[in-house]
Amino acid sequence: MASKHRYYNRAHGYVAWDYAYNMLNSCEPNGIIFTNGDNDTFPLWYIQEVEGVRKDVRVVNLSLLNTPWYIKQLRDLRPTASEYNNLIQEREGNEIIGQRFIKIGDGDIKDITNGLTRWKTRDVTFPVQSDQQITWSVKPTFAKQALKVQDMMIMQIINDANWTSPIYFAVTVSPGNRIGLENYLEMEGLAY
């Protein structure tokens, strides 16, 4: 076993670090990037939390986005410094309440994560600026009859961000998980 040690030594393995660095630097300041799962999320979290790289980018793991605990964690995260500066300085006692990353209550989270949401293909419209909007078709993503929790939450996050943060999908996110937004996505580095 000791003779094979050199094959398993990761001392100079920079793939995960380089991947994370390049992925985060594909995003504009204060961006939100949706990642596919553990293998493409953990390197980003590591480089942000341990190395301090691009902590302004909010990383959202689509696999975990199907769980109530993760949705609550995202909702309750303290804002990044740049988000904090953009908050409406509303106070309740000594606490700044301003805006949250996700603006839904526990009851709404329970409703969304309680099961699949029956869905027929329909157009979804979000305002972009005061006089403009984007419209795209959202098709059922589960058994051609329902939306997954992550799909509902992608729409919720885009709506709640109110176009104050650029939205990205990692290159590892399959087209089926981009909720029909392909016509509005453009590849920039390792993100759409």
Name the predicted role of every residue range.
Residues M1-N30, I47-Y192:
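ER/secretory pathway lumenal C-terminal domains and tails of membrane proteins involved
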Residues F42-Y46:
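Phosphate- and divalent-cation-binding pockets in alpha/beta enzyme and binding domains
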